Amino acid sequence: MVNSYIALGYKCNHNCLNCPLSTYDRLHGQLEPNIIKKNIKDLSVYGSNLHITISGGEPTLNPSFFDVLSILGKSNAYVTILSNATKCKDKDFVSKIIESLGYDYDLKRLRYITAVHSLHKSVHDRLTGTSGSLEETIKGLENLDKENFHVIIKNIMNKVTAKDMKETLNFLCNYFSNNIDFELCATDYSGRCGKNIDELYINFTDLQPYAEECLDSYEKDKDNCGRALEIIETPLCLVDPYYWKYFKTNNKKSLIYIAPNEESTNNISENTNSNCHTNYKECQECDVKEYCSGVWASTYNIEPNKEKIIRRIKSL
């Protein structure tokens, strides 16, 4: 499988406190339409062996969004869209996604991933910096759900979201159909998020009880809700080994990375690796590092007490 990531542009209709992009990126980072189409066409030759993640900013705002889907649909690629889903509150927009991919495209090959920070409007809208955003996102997810999209709702764990993470997951589990799965992930404190550390940062020692309580609640009701939950971009040592069954195996895969801030030819870099990794001295003697996604570099850099974010695990 050829893995690729393209940020169509950094324009966004939200103003999230935990956005890992800088203000400069958001003001200046847009790919030219001809660059987008050239790169997508070049990648589409991999056909059904291509998995591409489409992101931003908010990718649905980009004028080339539907053109990209059309090219990828014809090549039968696996597609992941990272979006706040607010544009999908319009049923016609969802229909245009299906039309662009092609009516013979298998929607099981597409994932639509959206963050819901809290079931409480006041919390979610404050984190997005956008009044009414929770209502719009939920409406968008409803429309995607009705069309049988494989939707994944993500909770980005930080000091604010951790407090009602369990209740938020329970609400979403009961609200949506079983087409919708869930992800939990650690926060990348880069960009604007780094300016809001006092409000958002929580070390993994303090996060652990919230995460385990959330997983315990999910396990209690999972037979009724019947969907998958996965933990990504988070170290295994966050929780007791009992919960490791929820973790995605490490993300030490190289990507073909296309983004406005890539200064190479056609804004493309090959063999790019994630900034969430185990390349820290504290991880080297851990017996499970090869299975672990590791810690965001931004987290490692801001936490002076490394024992609060990395705990070596020896021979289970």
Question: What does each model-found stretch correspond to?
Answer:
Residues 12, 16-19, 214, 225, ...:
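Disulfide-bonded cysteines in secreted/extracellular proteins and peptides
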Residues 37-53, 62-185:
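Radical SAM/AdoMet-radical enzyme domain recognition
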Residues 1-35, 46:
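Canonical Radical SAM [4Fe-4S] cluster-binding loop centered on the CxxxCxxC motif
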Residues 42-58, 307-316:
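Short Fe-S-cluster ligation motifs
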Residues 241-316:
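Flexible mid-to-C-terminal extensions adjoining Fe-S/redox cofactors in radical SAM and related proteins
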Residues 122, 126-271, 275:
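Radical SAM enzyme [4Fe-4S]-AdoMet core and its adjacent flexible, acidic
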